């Protein structure tokens, strides 16, 4: 079975406090990708932080309040939310940090005894996409894990490219590198 992981396509990462033009540019590609999967094959992560985010370890390293639980910035982009209609409620994962061990557990349950194929898209390539791709590879060492670069963006184009290089070293397949819509 093949699964799609949609990573953190939230307002704060697209148009909010950590938004970038690159994140906005990938939106049509991500919507297109979502539509190629059955809802049962899709898992969705959402970065989720408390009101005191700036006092946390992550907040001290990245002092920009974002994805505060219950805020507009925490919500999925409305077009993404619409495209994800029909995805089972238990496939949505609020995660308090970059990678989600809960995602790996849910994928194990969904895959059963199969060796799943896993594709990741979303934001930010160098933090949450990278972390979850490596978690998936560690959980399923015999699985093909891939990232569609045309459906990802990072803080800068350079950090995106660095993350893709790091994932390649971990035997994560990178598709559509160089075809990112924000490179045009």
Regions found by a protein language model. Name each.
Residues 84, 107, 111, 139-140:
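Active-site catalytic pocket residues across diverse enzymes, especially alpha/beta-hydrolases
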